[in-house]
Amino acid sequence: MSKKIAVLVTDQFEDIEYTSPVKAYEEAGYSVVAIDLEAGKEVTGKHGEKVKIDKAISDVDASDFDALLIPGGFSPDLLRADDRPGEFAKAFVENKKPVFAICHGPQVLIDTDLLKGKDITGYRSIRKDLINAGANYKDAEVVVSHNIVTSRTPDDLEAFNRESLNLLK
């Protein structure tokens, strides 16, 4: 049986931070479900990549999935303006399911009180936000802290994908 990975994504995501992990997960036999505030629409990445949204966040539950991916770009900042994406991500962490967040992706976790004491990385411009949320910020290509995998930039995708897949085993 194929595992399902939820992907929280909206307009202005960093294209390669969506396409590269999704390709890695699909090649490893996982199915991916794109989730935004409303289903059926198409969202566009910063460089023109199009993603059709499969499900609205109000129609899904973390228990339906085995892991969560949060790509970076401006998408996480737009998503966190609504409480539901953070609550959705919080359910994964609390249920010890993997959460993969790259670049600005950890922004979705900032308001959840889940970062306290965890080693986390992310894009340098959100470093202070992560520290203020209680995270131990690490400037490393990939950081694995319990069930959360984080990376800084698209340059870190190889390590990010590798550690994400390792956590899924």
Swiss-Prot record:
One Pfam family from the UniProt entry?
Answer: DJ-1_PfpI
EC numbers: 3.2.-.-
Which residues does UniProt mark as catalytic?
C103, H104
Record-given protein name: Putative cysteine protease YraA
Q: Which segments constitute the PfpI endopeptidase domain?
A: 3-169
Lineage, opening ranks: Bacteria, Bacillati, Bacillota, Bacilli, Bacillales
Single annotated GO MF: peptidase activity
According to its UniProt entry, what is the function of this protein? Functions in the protection against aldehyde-stress, possibly by degrading damaged proteins.
Q: Name one GO biological process term.
A: proteolysis
Q: What induces it?
A: The adhR-yraA operon is induced by formaldehyde and methylgloxal, under the control of AdhR. A second yraA-specific transcription unit is not induced by formaldehyde or methylglyoxal and is not controlled by AdhR. Transcribed under partial control of SigM ECF sigma factor.
What is the reported phenotype of gene knockout? Answer: No aldehyde-stress related phenotype; when combined with a yfkM disruption shows significantly reduced growth in the presence of formaldehye and methylglyoxal.
Keywords on record: Hydrolase, Protease, Stress response
Under the heading NCBIfam families, the entry gives: PfpI (TIGR01382)
Membership in a protein family: Belongs to the peptidase C56 family.
